Design a protein with these regions (language model features):
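N-terminal intrinsically disordered, cationic/polar leader segments
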Residues: 4, 18, 22-24, 29, ...
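Short glycine-/aliphatic-rich beta-strand segments at the starts of folded cytosolic domains
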Residues: 1-7
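C-terminal structural segments of small proteins and small subunits
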Residues: 49-78
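Amphipathic alpha-helical interaction surfaces in cytosolic regulatory modules
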Residues: 11-27, 35-50, 64
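Short, well-ordered coil↔helix boundary/capping segments
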Residues: 8-11, 59
Length: 78
């Protein structure tokens, strides 16, 4: 598992983010404070405070993880 910070602070970004991660069969969780939601759930994402970067837990390893990180690099923040 790897954790990165992502910024998905607009409706269009949320829709594109969900489309991007739904291409993979791995589990993705968004963590905001004490809330953990399935990152593939567009309704769940909209229940979070999107004005701040959110932790994304990626449950993949090896070459698969590298591919996922490349796809999600447009959302990643420091």
């Amino acid at each position: 598992m790897k954790t990165i910070k992502v910024s998905i602070n607009s409706i269009d970004k949320v829709k594109q983010f969900v489309n991007d991660i739904n291409r993979y069969s791995y589990d993705f969780d968004l963590v905001s404070g004490r809330y953990v939601i399935d990152a593939k759930s567009i309704m769940g994402i909209f229940s979070l405070d999107l004005s701040q970067p959110i932790d994304l837990n990626i449950h993949a390893e090896g070459a698969e993880l590298d591919e996922v990180l490349k796809t999600l690099s447009v959302y990643e923040v420091e």
